[in-house]
Amino acid sequence: MILVRNQIPLIALVLCGVLFCWLVLFWLITDSCHPIAMLTMPMSPVWTLGNLIAVFAMWVVMMIAMMLPSALPMILMHHRMARKNNQSFENISFTISYLFIWVFFSVLAVVLQFSAQKTGLLDPASLTTTKIISIILLIMAGIYQFTELKNTCLSKCRTPAGFFMGYWESGVLGAFKMGTRHGLFCLGCCWAIMLLLFVGGVMNLTWVLILTIAVVAEKTLPAGELISKLIGVGLILAAAYIGYGLFYGESMQSMSGMNMECMAQMKMS
């Protein structure tokens, strides 16, 4: 009980950090005419240095907002174990190294966004320009939910006690290594879901929140493994729905065109 009380400041600090990041995202989206917000949505395939820095900062803030909540149980468990060993700075090292992994992912995301926008696969709002790309990303993320790698990484993320029993290292450097390892497991668990940001839009706060809830649910709720599979099924069904709409729409347009041609020929005759 004493440990729980001692962890209240840590919980408050983490939640305040998450809230701050969400408020920054909300500001960027609602005040899109602000010069900084405009830098995060490059209108040209040729980015300026300001665009590069702003987009990277946006991704870092978004990753903290999305991924830190699901890491809270692991951070609290490490804090509890570190306090028993009288090592007060280890928890900071663990958390920072975990976030470094998502900073690294943000670098990759910026490179991917720049490359995709340059080739016309993404628009300035970071949305896929064709439904085919969205379908591919949804199917890929849906199938990945059923893979062994996903299950292994999810299991490591869901069991803080088991993780530290298997990988515990003492000292600040040891905590840094454990945080990095946990971050890599988390990245292995969630990278495919993160790519879905390009389906609903990086600047779509509702979509970002939906993906965050999905990540938190599968990593922290008691039925997380089942939730993970249901997410996979839902993503595949969403891809099928979009694919059906795309095929049906094209078929209707084709039939409409044929009908127009027939009517024109009848009028001429």
Question: Model segments located where?
Answer:
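Alpha-helical transmembrane segments
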Residues: G50-A65, L127-I143
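Residue-level signature of transmembrane alpha-helical entry/exit and packing/kink sites
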Residues: L10-V14, W47, N51-V55, E90, ...
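Transmembrane alpha-helix/helix-exit interface in multi-pass inner-membrane proteins
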Residues: V103-L121, K131-T159
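Hydrophobic alpha-helical transmembrane segments in multi-pass integral membrane proteins
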Residues: S106-Q113, F185, A240-S254
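Alpha-helical transmembrane segments of helical membrane proteins, especially in multi-pass transport
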Residues: G142-T152, G174, M178-V202
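Juxtamembrane transmembrane-helix termini in multi-pass membrane transport proteins
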Residues: F56-L99, V103
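A small-residue-rich subset of transmembrane alpha-helices
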Residues: Q87-S115, C189-A223, L230-L235
